Amino acid sequence: KKLPKNLPLKVKEIEKTTNHDVKAVELALGEKFKQKEFKNLIHIFLTSEDVNSFSYAIMMKEIQNASQNWVQEVISILNKMRSKYADLAMLSKTHGQPASPTTLGKEINVFKTRLEREIKTMKQLQARAKWGGATGNYNVHQLVFKKNWVTISRKFLKESEVELCEVSTQIEPHDFMAEQ
């Protein structure tokens, strides 16, 4: 099942009473399960880093989506300004000294083009999370249930448009955040 849209708000509400971020996520996710026996199994396989890396990935996706819309609006404004000031001559500078002439439209276009490139890069980046337990090896998972946990984890994360970091230690490296 898809995660509810209000999950972050629910987690924050629960966190007020638990004073523990991961426990709040566990309890909020547990509310999705109708059968009580499954509610109690949510945290059995996962470490705080598994839950946190997933949470970070979701937050980064939300930031990515929100900033793409905002940056797209800025690009649109810059594009109008570029056209409006295409012929407005001005003196450019290099090393703080007067240089050859340019136009204000061309200079605005420099920033518009850079933002367009960043939007393109942003759209290509994929949020990742680990889901393999204490050392990233699915040890507890395999001990309790002999399943293909990489496939199960990949499928679960994909439902939230998050890519599985298949090779990790206890900590997901968060490389995708640096790539943003």
Language model regions located:
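A helix-coil-helix interface module used to build multimeric assemblies
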Residues: 1-141, 145-158
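A conserved active-site cap/scaffold subdomain adjacent to cofactor or substrate pockets
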Residues: 172-180
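Acidic-glycine-rich active-site phosphate/pyrophosphate-binding loop
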Residues: 153-169
